[in-house]
């Protein structure tokens, strides 16, 4: 066997292995960027020796074989994938190839859209009624996922409108918004269930459940982007026209679709989407660029596995491989001990990453991680980098186990793990320097007491020099004492003292949030403040009374009750009030006297609003007698769903709670 034949055989074997892990097992071992590199290497070798191309080469087909647990559906029109480009030069070369093949000097009109990172599916409608749905599978045969697709509320079971074809197969992507993904993993960590590496794996795992009732509980959604079968009807003769027609029939289509009349316009679209990527609310890994004219698409045709008239312009990889050099343990404000992987520095999505969170001991066990392992690191948007999985096939010989501490790495106190919780905590409380620092940083933060100019480095020095032990000590600081800190001159010191004085005037809700009670976020603090009205009433509340507050269950109620039962916490509150911390007396709202559809209702906001900020919406709802909660429960009366609403919307639908959109909210606010 020639050396090049050996290379081809090894590359094909490696790619098939990773295709199986990705498409069939939903458990990829390497990042997409590494797979793309291997595929490019195979293509280049096959281009050198086309006589060695085999029919079963990964370059000659789309994906991997379907699972046998599902019935199979044969695609009447093959579901092809797209070729990729990774930089401007490659895209411009693709643009030139298209123009050369069309023998045209005029610019091609491109239709540009998002490259969603989910699971490709085909959905067949007959006379407007959904009759079947399938995964891509190997491009020729997919898995029958009809029962599961029917549970996705974004997908209409019946199309509406005129001139619907007798048989219409639409193609698109099923995906999981980031909020839904985080909620699924949060629940899994709490219950010991399967934790997904990323939203794409979670979407695939949710869609390919044998029990559709499980799929129905997952907040999956869908965007349509193409067509397969078309019989007994007509569609517009442009790609954008078809998308608009699909939308008119009730199929969801992304609103980020743009026509570009030049290569430069395409590059501008790419850059704008890349910039907006962290705020979309769902994962994408590039943009898709298609010739808009169907006539030109037909003229350009296909190669073995992809159309010549479209390409995926991928973003820099959000996943990379590197090595874990060590694991250190950090202590948070509630005593939670978090393992952090110290990595061989690696560029991920344009950022040099040298640390990644490992969450807790259960996560380390789930990953099977050892110090010295080669791992896949993921960084998406502003999310803290995390270890996705261990590359077991490349585990070095010299690795060592990760030993979770039995004593706090900062203060030496015992650690404990409460039964049913995933988190291990230091029991030292405020004698622990780490907990003290983090508690004080939380107390002065913008959403809490909002002490302008008091950053983390100042807090670190104040604790290390023993100037401050409790939040009340902050208000006793003088400009003279602050001037002794590093990089703190007289003017800066006086500014901090002035900011502390200004921060004394706050709100009851901000004060509660600043105290750092476990499980009490901003929304819960607002709910407690609105329900009890005064600190005295809240401190006297029983666990049963606390549970009457929207968004407060037994766990939160117990944490609040225990916080106020602790004498040292009550002492700190007394000291804070003695130092002049105050807030306005509560305004008593008699909801029975308010003529508003929101009066007396428990309302939850989810998704992003376009007409007003979330804070403005909350304020207007509260002014009209509503109680605004942070999560959906049986106590919820109404959910207001903005764009990219995730798990809260899904739970509301599951519980049969009334849901309205932003436009309806604005109409009712003015009613």
Curated annotation (Swiss-Prot):
One of its GO terms (biological process) is DNA repair. Zn(2+) binds at residues 408, 411, 426, 432. Residues 593-671 form the BRCT domain. Its cofactor is Mg(2+); Mn(2+). PROSITE patterns: BRCT, DNA_LIGASE_N1, DNA_LIGASE_N2. The active site is at 115 (n6-amp-lysine intermediate). It catalyses: NAD(+) + (deoxyribonucleotide)n-3'-hydroxyl + 5'-phospho-(deoxyribonucleotide)m = (deoxyribonucleotide)n+m + AMP + beta-nicotinamide D-nucleotide. The keyword Chaperone does not apply. Belongs to the NAD-dependent DNA ligase family. LigA subfamily. This is DNA ligase. It comes from Salmonella choleraesuis (strain SC-B67).
